[in-house]
């Protein structure tokens, strides 16, 4: 294979690895091939490397790797943000440096369109990274504690050992940012910030701005390469496309990387929209997954008290409690339908709850 084929193979493998590492721990994929590969790369391989290191190097390599991984994974740092910025900046620079045959034909509208598309990811990243995710402190605790009721299924009154106050329903203490966050979704390494009640909308904006840049790149370069296809020399549709892309390798690389990265970002965006549809956050999806595991093992019973559905484990269930055989039997009080869920994401403080 020549360099171009090797480069494409490397990009494809790297993208697959990123997909496995990003999505392998999602509850829906935990027991699929993706989840198994994630555990293989994140658990099995490190374990065997540690065994070899302990045997032949007295554990020195493992200690160094633990120190590095602790900084990357468990310390609030901007490394992945810099990686994101480097990727899109190199791609944009390559487009303008090697795409003079396109840009010299641009009209004013084209330039406005391209420059707007280029600037949006930088602006949205800054907004998402600098936004307050919904930090809870003593000043706003009363308001935050009334925002959502406890469902007594996945959220119960519980004190935060770090912040020293009772955690409001749907909140969580982020060990990276060292704050409690309202309606905690997850800590996002791509924006180096938590995603919570106040800035989930900005996280969505960041994803949308990223995907529009990738789509813009795919459409413009795709149109360009389609015009370069030589159907007389390469009558096959795919071969004519392939050789058109190879004829301008630098732009071809930008096109292919945009194509592959767009799949990754679309998967992430699709998963986030699924969570909105389902009426829970990434953090809550893990709790619901644990509950589903208990239901599958026939360990959960339900009963009603003052019109509210409550759950109990088999050992604590009363005689009149009903065995839960399906997750569809369990009410999610935080799910108000896709429209209302999305509305509350965009306008987070126009909430639908009024607890006392």
Swiss-Prot record:
Task: Supply the EC number(s).
Answer: 2.3.1.225
Q: Which reaction does it catalyse?
A: L-cysteinyl-[protein] + hexadecanoyl-CoA = S-hexadecanoyl-L-cysteinyl-[protein] + CoA
Stored Pfam families: DHHC (PF01529)
Residue ranges, Cytoplasmic side: 24-78, 129-201, 275-356
Lumenal side stretches = 1-2, 100-107, 223-253
Q: Does the keyword Membrane apply?
A: yes
**GO biological-process terms attached to the record:** protein targeting to membrane
Q: What topology does the record note for this protein and the membrane?
A: Multi-pass membrane protein
Membrane-crossing ranges are: 3-23, 79-99, 108-128, 202-222, 254-274
Q: Where is the DHHC domain?
A: 158-208
Top EC class of this enzyme:
transferase
One GO cellular component, as annotated: endoplasmic reticulum membrane
Extract the coiled-coil ranges from the record: none
GO molecular function terms listed in the Swiss-Prot or TrEMBL record: protein-cysteine S-palmitoyltransferase activity
Query: Where is the protein found, in the record's own terms?
Result: Endoplasmic reticulum membrane
Describe the family membership recorded for this protein in Swiss-Prot or TrEMBL. Answer: Belongs to the DHHC palmitoyltransferase family. SWF1 subfamily.
| Comment on protein domains | The DHHC domain is required for palmitoyltransferase activity.
State the function annotated in the UniProt record.
Palmitoyltransferase that targets several endosomal SNAREs. Palmitoylates the SNAREs at cysteine residues close to the cytoplasmic end of their transmembrane domain. May have a role in the cellular quality control of transmembrane domain-containing proteins.
Q: What is this protein called?
A: Palmitoyltransferase swf1
Which gene name does the record give?
A: swf1
């Amino acid at each position: 294979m020549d360099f171009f084929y090797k480069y494409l193979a490397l990009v494809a493998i790297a993208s697959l690895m990123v997909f496995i590492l990003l999505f392998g721990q999602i509850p829906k994929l935990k027991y699929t091939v993706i989840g198994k590969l994630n555990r293989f790369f994140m658990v099995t391989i490190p374990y065997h490397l540690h065994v070899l290191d302990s045997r032949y190097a007295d554990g020195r390599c493992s200690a160094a790797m633990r120190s590095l991984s602790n900084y990357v994974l468990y310390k609030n740092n901007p490394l992945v943000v810099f990686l994101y910025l480097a990727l899109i900046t190199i791609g944009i620079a390559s487009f303008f440096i090697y795409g003079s045959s396109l840009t010299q034909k641009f009209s004013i509208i084209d330039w406005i369109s391209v420059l707007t598309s280029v600037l949006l990811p930088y602006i949205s990243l800054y907004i998402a990274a600098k936004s307050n995710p919904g930090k809870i402190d003593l000043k706003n605790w009363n308001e935050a504690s009334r925002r959502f009721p406890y469902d007594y299924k996945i959220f119960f009154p519980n004190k935060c050992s770090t912040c020293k106050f009772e955690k409001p329903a749907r909140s969580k203490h982020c060990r990276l940012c060292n704050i409690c966050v309202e309606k905690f979704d997850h800590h996002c390494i791509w924006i180096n910030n938590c995603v919570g009640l106040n800035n989930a909308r900005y996280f969505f904006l960041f994803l949308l701005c990223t995907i529009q840049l990738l789509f813009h790149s795919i459409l413009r370069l795709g149109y360009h390469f389609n015009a370069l296809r030589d159907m007389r020399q390469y009558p096959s549709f795919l071969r004519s496309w392939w050789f058109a892309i190879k004829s301008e390798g630098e732009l071809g690389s930008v096109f292919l990387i945009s194509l592959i990265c767009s799949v990754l970002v679309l998967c992430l965006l699709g998963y986030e929209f699924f969570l909105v549809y389902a009426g829970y956050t990434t953090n809550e999806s893990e709790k619901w997954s644990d509950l589903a595991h208990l239901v599958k093992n026939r360990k959960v019973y339900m009963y009603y008290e003052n019109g509210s559905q409550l759950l109990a484990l088999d050992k604590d269930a009363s005689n009149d409690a009903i065995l839960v055989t399906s997750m569809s039997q369990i009410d999610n009080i935080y799910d108000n339908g896709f429209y209302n869920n999305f509305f509350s994401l965009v306008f987070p403080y126009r909430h639908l709850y009024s607890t006392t």
